[in-house]
Swiss-Prot record:
Keywords: ATP-binding, Magnesium, Nucleotide-binding, Transferase, tRNA processing. GO terms for molecular function: ATP binding; tRNA dimethylallyltransferase activity. It comes from Clostridioides difficile (strain 630). Gene3D superfamilies: 1.10.20.140, P-loop containing nucleotide triphosphate hydrolases. This is tRNA dimethylallyltransferase.
Length: 311
């Protein structure tokens, strides 16, 4: 059976994925599947830098505004829904463009990760529960941070069930020291991985500027509205960068200025971790946006690369 080409456009936060993804989709007759763990949530628009309807320019997007902020969305569920949408898009004879920077979401499509198998791994779960009883939640949360810092940052340490579940996913059928070791490529798809990057200082400037724009556009008001709607601060969705810092400002833990600076700092650190993650994709083609006169020049070069890559 012919593999479905899976065009994956990724890169660190604020690099410029959204604009380019729309241009690529329009030129390649593609529909877009979002691989962003924050844009999945309704009502969380400003802090997630969610693509707007106007920005979409009529290009169909999937896995945006998919669930309410109190829904415990998992990597396993992302994989199930994304696979369903991939087949729907393919049936329409359109290209599939996956765009976003959540590494675990991308891995769940690139590699043959069987979450049903991890669901059945009772022995591992019992061992983790035993460690939890002996060493406590702080130890377990720190262990998760070593394996998957992004999930650890989003899962509150008091949510023991989610911490254990995330550790199960990380530890199922692989070596602990490298998430993608021992994983085989998904045989259904031909992943064509494109990683966007920029000069580090320029990227950090863009991150700082984006945070300033989020604040100006009403991030504080967005968080207040979420609280007024009954969404709690210990929810997974509320642990996202931008949201957790504003919550601490509203609780009086940070000043307004401190909250903004910490969002910028944490976003820069996140970008650095993302770049490290993407370097594991040995077949990926990297493009430095700062080396191009304009976005159309870059878009045309990427389209040529994609056409040459499709088997």
């Amino acid at each position: 059976m012919k593999k479905i080409p899976l065009i994956i456009l990724t890169g660190p936060t604020a690099v410029g994925k959204t604009d380019l993804s729309i241009k690529l989709a329009k030129d390649m007759n593609a529909e877009i599947i979002s691989a962003d763990s924050m844009q999945i949530y309704e009502y969380m628009d400003i802090g997630s830098a969610k693509v707007t309807e106007k920005e979409m320019q009529g290009v169909k997007h999937y896995l945006i505004d998919e669930v309410k902020p109190d829904y415990p969305f998992s990597v396993s569920e992302f994989q199930q829904r994304a696979k369903k949408y991939i087949h729907e898009i393919n049936k329409k004879e359109k290209c599939v463009l996956v765009t976003g920077g959540t590494g675990l979401y991308l891995n769940s499509l690139i590699y043959n990760m069987d979450f049903a198998q991890s669901d059945a791994n009772n022995e591992l779960r019992e061992e983790l529960q035993k460690q939890l009883a002996e060493k406590g939640i702080d130890y377990m949360h720190n262990k998760l941070k070593e394996l998957d810092e992004e999930s650890a940052n989003r899962i509150h340490k008091n949510n023991t069930k989610r911490v254990i579940r995330a550790l199960e996913v990380c530890l199922s059928g692989k070596k602990m020291n490298d998430f993608s070791s021992d994983l085989k490529f998904n045989e259904e798809y031909q992943p064509i991985i494109i990683v966007l990057n920029r000069d580090r200082e320029h990227l950090y400037q863009r991150i700082n500027m984006r945070v300033d724009i989020m604040i100006k556009n009403g991030l504080v008001e967005e968080v207040k509205k979420l609280l007024s709607m009954g969404f709690k601060k210990d929810m997974i969705s509320m642990q996202g960068i931008g949201y957790k810092e504003i919550l601490k400002y509203l609780d009086g833990e940070y000043t307004y200025e401190e909250a903004i600076e910490i969002i910028k700092r944490d976003s820069r650190r996140y970008a650095k971790r993302q770049i490290t993650w993407f370097k594991r994709y040995k077949t990926a083609k990297w493009f430095d946006l700062d080396q191009y006169e304009n976005i159309d020049e870059l878009k045309n070069e990427i389209i040529l690369y994609i056409k040459d890559s499709i088997k």
